């Protein structure tokens, strides 16, 4: 595709998305279906603006690649190990059962047994991009059904490898026999990627982050994702699987959240392009000439996969209110069918329009999924009483933070140690890479990044956290964070560090009441000790400290409207006289009472 044609195609994609997606969302059918309809409109069977569908479809697979990298970042090896039974149990059972049933049905419609095997495997796979997008839209990502769905999708990605190797064997081509030496070299190269990634990625990103240039960090992230995808494609393996592994290798690193926000904009655009390309690939000519066959095929495909998934969910022990959602979200055919059916060896297996019919059925099944999920939601809302599942608590991820601490200097470290000592889950954001490396050596969950970026806060768990503690060195950063949290995360309890009275006044004006002036409490404590050394009783010194704290806080609030005005000078003098009078009354009161307690430090 020439440069000018590529630019024109890009403009058409953006225009179609800007028009179709908001309309689809307003109609309540979801963004994914909007992208698919936009693709049909501008594709060769619609208005005909774009005809080179195959090249665009291949390029748009990068959206799935970026999505799998972000999913990998959200899963560490320990969590993957916990999911092993659902990945290799439910996932394997779904692929084998669905492929066997669908392959058998294809044989009854005139497919050879070899073509039926390939067709059954291709149809058994679900759309990773579609399913994960719908899971996020429906809030399933952190539920047990969402985790089980992800396990099934992950096994399907793993199953791509043997499926691609099986097709040449079924085609029976002599020049496509299995070269076991080549297979062995690919396995070694794959192992080398795992080992190299495990020990090299973090030092490389540490070196890049130390430059302090954000654009270079973004470029390095793109290089990692695209390089992993290209490497896996060269091995004949799934590009998405390669980037998923790269994400998992960095899931426990201090750069996890910064990597996620660097990739997220590209992921969203490329995923949209992928769905548009799938819509463009819909062959309406085949649909018109074989309308009944296609309609029955789509219905059977969705019904068989839903039945298999529902039964497996029941055997797995998924609670009743989530089984239908789990089965529905994975009921469609997937993007892997386009890859598998388009192989030269596969094309020799299919006769006449068989491959085109299967691809049309897959595309339409993807288009029906958003509507199916909408219907399932309505059905569940009518038939299920929330009380029906009270005996089964929903699965909730246990490593999401309760508190986010921004800045981990001496001030933030004291807060973090106190919270961790009381078993609170914290996530720390710090933009000084040397401090990040030091604190992670001591076992703190510290991540590199600039917390004044909205997406970094969201990635760090601000939507699930209960509180945020802001301990930035710069007052401007503190106020920017306060404004951002109030606008985008209003549920968060905001606690902030103020360097002095001016910053305290600004926080009060912004509506933040939970703050601490960094030297105030320590100065008061030292002042209390000074009173004791001058002969004052510890109990009396303690009360003096409390009176001073209360009066100072009251003054702070009263002077907030005029904290930049000379009016506050006279008010400060009045407050000092008031404080002296309070202390005089306290002295007289204490002289008539017995000692309360002695200093014990």
Swiss-Prot record:
Gene3D superfamilies reported for this sequence: 1.20.1530.20, NAD(P)-binding Rossmann-like Domain (3.40.50.720)
Biological process annotations from GO: proton transmembrane transport
Keywords: Antiport, Cell inner membrane, Cell membrane, Ion transport, Membrane, Potassium, Potassium transport, Transmembrane, Transmembrane helix, Transport
Keyword Transmembrane helix: yes
Pfam families recorded: Na_H_Exchanger, TrkA_N
Limits of the RCK N-terminal domain: 400-519
GO cellular component: plasma membrane
GO molecular function: glutathione-regulated potassium exporter activity
Transmembrane portions of the chain: 4-24, 29-49, 55-75, 87-107, 115-135, 152-172, 177-197, 207-227, 230-250, 268-288, 291-311, 326-346, 356-376
Topological type in the membrane: Multi-pass membrane protein
Location in the cell: Cell inner membrane
HAMAP family on file: K_H_efflux_KefB
Function: Pore-forming subunit of a potassium efflux system that confers protection against electrophiles. Catalyzes K(+)/H(+) antiport.
Family annotation (NCBIfam families): 2a37, PRK03659.1
Protein family according to the UniProt entry: Belongs to the monovalent cation:proton antiporter 2 (CPA2) transporter (TC 2.A.37) family. KefB subfamily.
Description of how the protein assembles with itself and partners: Interacts with the regulatory subunit KefG.
Protein name: Glutathione-regulated potassium-efflux system protein KefB
Organism: Klebsiella pneumoniae (strain 342)
Gene transcribed to yield this protein: kefB
């Amino acid at each position: 595709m020439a440069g000018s044609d590529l630019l024109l195609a890009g403009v058409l994609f953006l225009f179609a998305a800007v028009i179709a997606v908001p309309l689809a969302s307003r109609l309540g059918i979801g963004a994914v279906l909007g992208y698919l309809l936009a693709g049909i409109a501008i594709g060769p069977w619609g208005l005909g603006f774009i005809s080179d569908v195959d090249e665009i479809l291949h390029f748009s697979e990068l959206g799935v690649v970026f999505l799998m990298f972000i999913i990998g970042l959200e899963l560490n090896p320990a969590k993957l190990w916990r999911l092993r039974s659902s990945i290799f149990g439910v996932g394997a059972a779904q692929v084998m059962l669905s492929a066997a049933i669908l392959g058998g049905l294809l044989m009854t419609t005139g497919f050879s047994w070899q073509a039926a095997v390939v067709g059954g495997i291709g149809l058994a796979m679900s759309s990773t991009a579609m399913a994960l997008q719908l899971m996020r839209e429906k809030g399933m990502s952190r539920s047990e059904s969402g985790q089980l769905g992800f396990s099934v999708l992950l096994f399907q990605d793993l199953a791509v490898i043997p499926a691609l190797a099986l097709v040449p064997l079924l085609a029976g081509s002599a020049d496509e026999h299995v070269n076991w030496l080549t297979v062995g070299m690919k396995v070694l190269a794959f192992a080398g990627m795992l080992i190299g990634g495990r020990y090299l990625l973090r030092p490389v990103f540490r070196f890049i982050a130390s430059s302090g240039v954000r654009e270079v960090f973004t470029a390095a992230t793109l290089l990692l994702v695209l390089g992993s995808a290209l490497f896996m494609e060269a091995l004949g393996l799934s590009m998405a699987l390669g980037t998923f592994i790269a994400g998992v290798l960095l899931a426990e690193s201090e750069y996890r959240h910064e990597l996620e926000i660097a990739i997220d904009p590209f992921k969203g655009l490329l995923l949209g392009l992928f769905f548009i390309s799938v819509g463009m690939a819909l062959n309406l000519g085949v649909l018109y000439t074989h309308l009944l066959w296609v309609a029955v095929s789509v219905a059977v495909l969705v019904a068989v996969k839903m039945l298999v998934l529902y039964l497996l969910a029941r055997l797995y022990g998924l609670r009743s209110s989530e089984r239908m959602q789990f089965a529905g979200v994975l009921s469609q055919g997937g993007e892997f069918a386009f890859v598998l059916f388009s192989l030269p060896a596969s094309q020799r297996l299919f006769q006449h329009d068989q491959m085109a019919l299967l691809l049309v059925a897959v595309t339409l099944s993807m288009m029906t999924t958003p509507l199916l999920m909408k219907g399932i939601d309505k059905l569940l809302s009518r038939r299920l009483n929330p009380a029906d599942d009270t005996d089964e608590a929903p699965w909730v991820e246990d490593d999401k933070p309760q508190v986010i601490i921004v800045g981990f200097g001496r001030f933030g470290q004291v807060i973090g140690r106190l919270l961790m000592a009381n078993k609170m889950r914290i996530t720390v954001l710090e933009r000084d890479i040397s401090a990040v490396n030091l604190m992670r050596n001591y076992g703190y969950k510290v991540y590199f990044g600039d917390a004044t970026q909205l997406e970094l806060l969201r990635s760090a768990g601000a939507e699930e956290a209960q509180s945020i503690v802001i301990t930035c060195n710069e007052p401007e950063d503190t106020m920017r964070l306060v404004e951002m949290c109030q606008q985008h995360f209003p549920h968060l309890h905001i606690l902030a560090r103020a360097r002095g009275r001016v910053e305290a006044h600004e926080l009060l004006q912004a509506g933040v009441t939970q703050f601490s002036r960094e030297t105030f409490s320590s100065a008061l404590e030292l002042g209390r000790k000074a009173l004791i050394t001058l002969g004052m009783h510890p109990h009396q010194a303690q009360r003096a400290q409390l009176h001073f704290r209360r009066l100072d806080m009251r003054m702070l609030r009263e002077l907030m409207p005029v904290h930049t005005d000379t009016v506050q000078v006279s008010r400060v003098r009045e407050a000092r006289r008031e404080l002296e009078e309070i202390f005089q009354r306290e002295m007289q009161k204490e002289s008539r009472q017995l000692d309360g307690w002695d200093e014990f430090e």
